[in-house]
Regions:
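Non-transmembrane, aqueous-exposed alpha-helical and coiled segments at domain scale
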Residues: 315, 324, 330-362, 368-417
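Short glycine/proline-rich, acidic loop/turn segments that cap or connect secondary-structure elements
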Residues: 413-431
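Long, contiguous, compositionally biased segments that the model treats as domain-scale units
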Residues: 2-154
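Glycine-rich, charged/polar anion/phosphate-binding loops
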Residues: 64-66, 288-291, 318, 346-349
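Active-site-facing alpha/beta catalytic cores
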Residues: 86-87, 92-338, 381, 406-408, ...
Length: 463
């Protein structure tokens, strides 16, 4: 049966909130962080084409993730969500994609081994092509142009042609997301994540890392455990040769998201089939805004970034709108306070949600609240602040009687120097050597692995 032939189904959102919802009802709200396309005809043509293209994910994958996130809310799983600040179309090549997957697999191996529980692996890629900006325009040497808003909207080069929003880029974003998803699925189905051979996940350039010995000891321990289990069973354990892997991105460019919001056979309501796990950021989380209106109607698990300016009342009202039936696995709050503010700002939010008996998954984004600029103009993050915010999150949740259920990190499997500190003690002078991000700084492989190890050590302390 074609998607267009699916019969209308009851709208569970309207029943819950008393307000009618459709994939385009967001258009009646204030939509922030949206580009202005100069050619409405070209925009309509691109969206028409996008609507007829196949979805990027499936309904059963989305619902499986929601069930796993519900288990994370109960403390039975831990969420690892990571990837680029903003993907570039040029990064859609095998080496970059496999390295992204490798670093997440290695981090998850550390967490599974140390936390003794399953890890939900979610990539912040295969669709993370839009980026909110603090200003609509950028000025250089007296020339003012539209800000770069991610490859799905415009190009980073500082020219008038590059910065002009181009709706055809949405079609390119769909194609690059599909190629990325296809390659990730092929790697996983082909045994790339096989626990019988975790040594295959190694990144060659880190063979001399200060963390290498500790990690290789862990790999050997897991290999011994697998061998022992198979010896007892008298046969090879085949379900160790693949994993579940999901994607996420910021649902920022609503025309794109709407075009990939579909109904499917034997499922009520609407699903965003561009990603498994959409989120919205602080700049677009207004209760009466277009982005909240859009997210309230899709059946995907969703997440909201929560910053230091959010009040307990705002948080509870967001829950009322986005998860009125307290559905397990539906709603995550990703707090991003910054190491300097988390001790003051997070506890009142935890207390309010707990006191009201609301069901959410708490996730720590230790990146966005710790961004700073160096004297020579680089945006960076200090590793000690990133690690410190993660560790304080565990302490604050333990004190509040709540549970930190995951982390959300901007990272890469490449040998970049964008965040200072870490095992190699990178300094501001090192930033010039391999700073490749077009937007925000990312943890490199070693720093990412070190965060995973810090999570394990901290969890052992607060148990």
């Amino acid at each position: 049966m074609s998607l267009s032939a699916v019969s209308p189904v009851p709208d569970p959102v309207a029943a819950a909130t008393g307000a009618a919802w459709s994939p385009e009802s967001w258009r009646g709200k204030t939509a922030l962080q949206m580009p202005t396309y100069p050619d409405p005809v070209a925009l309509d043509a691109a969206l028409h084409e996008l609507k007829r293209l196949p979805p990027l994910v499936t309904s059963w994958e989305i619902l499986a993730l929601k069930q796993q996130l519900a288990e994370a809310q109960e403390g039975k799983r831990f969420l690892l969500q990571g990837g680029d600040c903003a993907e570039n179309f040029s990064d859609c090549e095998s080496g970059t994609i496999s390295n992204r997957l490798r670093v997440l697999l290695q981090m998850s191996l550390v967490l599974v081994h140390g936390l003794r529980q399953p890890v939900i692996r979610v990539g912040r890629f295969a669709g993370q092509y839009a980026k909110p900006r603090s200003a609509d325009t950028e000025t250089r040497d007296g020339v003012t142009l539209p800000s770069y808003r991610g490859d799905v909207i415009n190009a980073p080069a500082f020219t008038e042609a590059a910065r002009l929003p181009d709706p055809k880029r949405m079609l390119q974003a769909h194609a690059h997301s599909a190629m990325t998803m296809n390659f990730v699925r092929a790697l996983i189905d082909g045994g790339f994540a096989d626990l019988h051979h975790p040594e295959y996940w190694n990144l060659e350039w880190v063979s001399h890392s200060p963390l290498a010995a500790e990690y290789q000891k862990m790999v050997a321990s897991i290999g011994d455990a697998v061998h022992f289990m198979e010896t007892l069973a008298g046969a090879r354990v085949h379900n160790l040769n693949r994993i579940d892997f999901y994607t996420s991105h910021e649902a920022l460019l609503l025309p794109y998201e709407q075009a990939l919001t579909r109904q499917v056979p034997r499922q009520q309501g609407w699903l965003n089939l561009s990603t498994h796990y959409p989120w919205i950021g602080m700049r677009t989380a207004a209760l009466d805004g277009a982005h909240v209106e859009y997210l309230r109607g899709v059946r995907n698990p969703i997440a909201i970034k929560v910053g230091p300016s959010v009040t307990p009342d705002q948080l509870l009202r967001l829950i009322d709108v986005l998860n009125p039936h307290d559905e397990p696995g539906r709603l995550s709050f990703i707090h991003r306070m910054g190491a300097a503010q988390i001790a003051e700002k997070l506890p009142p939010l935890l207390d309010a949600v707990k006191r009201d008996g609301r069901r959410v998954l708490w996730v720590c984004d230790a990146m966005h609240g710790n961004t700073e600029s160096t004297a020579n103009g680089f945006k960076t993050r200090r590793f000690d602040n990133v690690r410190g915010e993660v560790e304080m999150s565990f302490d604050l949740h333990a004190a509040a009687g709540t549970r930190l259920g995951g982390v959300h990190l901007e990272l890469t499997g490449e040998d970049v120097t964008e965040c200072t500190g870490g095992a190699r003690e990178l300094t501001e002078r090192d930033l010039e050597r391999a700073y490749r991000s077009t937007v925000d700084p990312r943890l490199n492989y070693e720093q990412s692995l070190e965060i995973a190890m810090a999570i394990v050590r901290k969890q052992e302390q607060v148990r």
